[in-house]
Amino acid sequence: MAKLKFQNHTFTLEPYESVLDCLLRNAQTIPYACKAGTCQACLIRTIACEATAESKKWIKNALQDKGYTLACQWLPEQDVHAALPTIEEFSVAVLISELVMLNKSVMRVKLDVKDPAEMFHYRPGQYLSLINPDGIIRSYSIANSYEKDQCIELHIANTEHGIFTQWLFKSAVVGMKIHIRGPSGTCFYNDAIEKDQVLVMAGTGTGLAPLYGIARDALTHGHSGPITFYHGGRSDAHLYYREQLLALQHEFPLFDYRPCTIDASSDPAVLTGRLEQIVEAQLDSSHLQKMRFFLCGAPTFVFDMRKRIYLKGARADNIICDPFTERNVTPT
């Protein structure tokens, strides 16, 4: 059977076993999350060997050229040698410039890049990985354009058992240095989108962040078709960024912001009901095939919403999804 050399240790790979599973089975320290190639937390560097094409296809060509691959997707059939990359090898140093609560559980985090020359290009709506001083990694969607704002904006929800968020909400301070890696994800405004295409955006919780970034990006690029923006929460207290979205609606008449809550609201502008049911009920079936959808947030919502609009007549390739699933990176 094939051997895996890692951090001065040698392990035997089981048949059809990934490098990640082998390392975890042998109690080695490596960050990981989804085990599906999406989060890219388990990035490793090959040494004097070649990783499989399948394990490399998930990452950018620039990283492939430097010998990186994903441990979760690499199933070696011969002896291999790998190592964890250092922070300096694959990340950009940033400073926390703002920590502001947007509601009781969501914080806006702004990051300044220490050396703008090192900053990578991204599109609003993609996500990047944050690496805190303890080496814990977590991925978050990007809510803005770095080129326009000269900072990176993230919206982060506090989770009771989240190692990273507990650090962020309790210990992080403005001026602290952390690192970022990215970008990843395909949920963004594509330049190939027809400028007059009808766009429907729907998200729950901090699913607002990528959608807000995508909407602004579309409008900045001269999108002239209607954009309907749904944001859902359990109650009024779970909604946020209402002033910003109303301002966007005032500036761009074709942008239509529709807040939704499960609990009844005292605000007549807020729609009451489950977000997926509200969106489905308001869609015009005769035009669904020409619409493009962006769905972000809780996986249960994203998958249900995708199924509903597809069965109603939307084209599968016009439904762009970012379910916030399996992004919690586990430090071992």
Residue ranges and their predicted role:
Residues 212-220:
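Histidine-anchored nucleotide/phosphate-binding helix
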Residues 220-226:
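Conserved S-adenosyl-L-methionine
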Residues 68-89, 177-180:
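Short, structured interface segments
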Residues 90-177, 197, 233-235, 261-263:
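Ferredoxin-reductase
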Residues 1-71, 80, 226, 230-332:
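Reductase modules of NAD(P)H-dependent flavoproteins
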Residues 125, 207, 298:
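Short, conserved phosphate/pyrophosphate- and ester-handling motifs at nucleotide-, phospho-/glycolipid
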Residues 183-194:
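A short, basic/flexible loop-to-alpha-helix module at the beginning of a structural domain
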Residues 4, 82-85, 128-133, 176-182:
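Short conserved beta-strand and strand-loop elements enriched in small hydrophobics
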